[in-house]
């Protein structure tokens, strides 16, 4: 029996705050235009009480990590067309990451969406990866705003990527 090749489209975006209705509307239109299966966003700046503002038609499943202040915040949205069944959701109280483990289209998968703070971003990212290593498997996708250039194409200067960052890529 031949298995049909399928792909899964995941988009990610640092929205730098969603308190403005205009910005939320633009995000909604952008998400719909991408025709993706999963959308990961960083820096929502929404509190737990405001998370309903992330509603997008055709995207019922919205998983998020927020804090009490209007800072940070990450979310993962799953399109209704995706067969998604969560098994584990792990989030930090500061709204800097959310890890979702489950099945997507009957395939085991883990998605880790990170917003690393500007200060000590590399160490912060390493710590998150250490804290979540028991949930991370070979079918793990790490997305987000790491505030760290992971490759030469991410840099605006010709300065080389240091060894610590190269190790993070492995």
Question: What residue spans do the PLM features occupy?
Answer:
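A shared catalytic/ligand-binding motif for oxyanion handling
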Residues: 1-170
């Amino acid at each position: 029996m031949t298995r049909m090749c399928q792909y899964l489209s995941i988009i990610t975006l640092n929205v730098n705050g969603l308190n403005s209705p205009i910005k939320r509307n633009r995000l909604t239109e952008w998400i719909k235009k991408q025709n993706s299966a999963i959308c990961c966003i960083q820096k929502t700046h929404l509190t737990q009480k405001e998370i309903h503002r992330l509603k997008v038609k055709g995207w019922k499943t919205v998983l998020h990590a927020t804090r009490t202040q209007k800072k940070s915040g990450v979310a993962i949205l799953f399109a209704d067309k995706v067969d998604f069944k969560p098994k584990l959701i792990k989030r930090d109280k500061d709204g800097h990451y959310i890890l979702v483990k489950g099945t997507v289209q009957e395939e085991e998968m883990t998605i880790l969406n990170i917003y690393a703070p500007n200060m000590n971003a590399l160490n912060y990212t390493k710590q998150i990866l250490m804290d979540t290593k028991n949930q991370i498997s070979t079918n793990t996708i790490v997305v987000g705003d790491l505030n760290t250039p992971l490759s030469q194409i991410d840099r605006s200067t010709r300065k080389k990527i240091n060894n610590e960052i190269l190790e993070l890529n492995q």
